[in-house]
Amino acid sequence: MIPARPLSGHSSLLPLALALSALLLAPAAHAEKADRDKPINIESNRLEYNDATKVSTFIGSVVLTKGTIRITGDRMVLTQVGRNAQTARVNGTQASFRQKRDGMEQYIHGVADQIFYDTRTDQVTLTGRARLQRQNCNQPVDEITGGHIVYSASTETFSVDGQQRGERPG
């Protein structure tokens, strides 16, 4: 279930948030096995929902959590793409992604201008000034940078493109 909790002072969103939470379920496999069956929770300052298109737009201090997964940004567009799947496009001044690695005290941490999360493929795509780190006790162990990074949470693999998609080499 995806409860969308309004921040204090925004209780008028509660009925809409409750209706939205009944619609959005997301079972998916993740690097951290404990994340698989966790619900998605989203917090933001404002929520706009279109029932016809199944698109929710969260605006202001957006935080998506699912188990150990945490994605933050200024704005997120969440689209229902099937019965049990969603995509989330997060924008912001360096949107961020973090997930605990399975069976160890390490995290994968990424930042980019835009982050795209797809529950169907269990992939996170970072675009624009993208950086991905493997961290141990919040200290970087490895780091990669590029215009476009695709990270597969289920296989813990990634691919990097030095330029953003559509950008031509100089």
PLM segments and residue spans:
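Mature-chain termini and adjacent capping regions
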Residues: 1-170
